[in-house]
A protein has these predicted regions:
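A short, structured N-terminal alpha-helical element that caps or precedes a catalytic domain
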Residues: 1-180
């Protein structure tokens, strides 16, 4: 969660967008997100606070459809009033905020780290128990942007706690890469 919160923050998005030259993003969707980068940077901290339940009053602003920058995930919006009319403003806003985060996630996957996922980072590397060649190869590559965030957070925790022993639990294939 800490990695996601660091990544999906004003400072995190500024670093992401700063790593790419203006012309590097490839798809139309990525070009749109990059063009709206200032809007994403301006809104991300508020959206995360809303999704954490720390700013519920933002729901009305999110639902105006003028607050969040929109890219391809918003193309799948059908009749929002039909879908959320009875469920209320909070649920509609959570749905829109999730689409917003998924747009950013798509951008990260395409331009920063193809293995990124909210809960399944590099999952494909741990799915095949008969060979760890892909995992070994990935571990021998240069660290990714997200690797650096993860390792910095880990270093801070280790320095603060100064444990004698560190153990990692790997309950799902999507956790295997991060454990190494």
């Amino acid at each position: 969660i800490e990695v996601i919160l660091k990544l999906f923050s004003k400072a995190g998005l500024q670093k992401i967008f700063a790593t790419l030259p203006d012309s590097q993003s490839s798809s139309e969707n990525s070009h749109r997100i990059f063009a709206l980068k200032n809007d994403y940077v301006k809104t991300i901290d508020q959206v995360i606070l809303f999704l954490q339940g720390k700013n519920p009053t933002l729901a009305r602003q999110i639902c105006t459809m003028n607050f969040l920058p929109e890219s391809s995930r918003f193309n799948q919006l059908d009749d929002m009033e039909f879908a959320f009319g009875n469920m209320g403003l909070q649920d509609k806003a959570k749905h829109l905020a999730t689409l917003y985060l998924e747009d950013i996630s798509d951008f990260i996957i395409e331009n920063i780290d193809p293995d990124f996922g909210f809960s399944r980072y590099a999952e494909r590397l741990g799915k095949s128990a008969n060979s760890f060649d892909d995992l070994y190869a990935k571990l021998n590559e240069n660290r990714t942007f997200i690797d650096e965030i993860s390792l910095n957070i880990l270093a801070q925790k280790l320095e603060f706690v100064q444990p004698k022993l560190v153990c990692f639990s790997v309950p799902f294939p999507g956790n295997l890469y991060a454990a190494f």
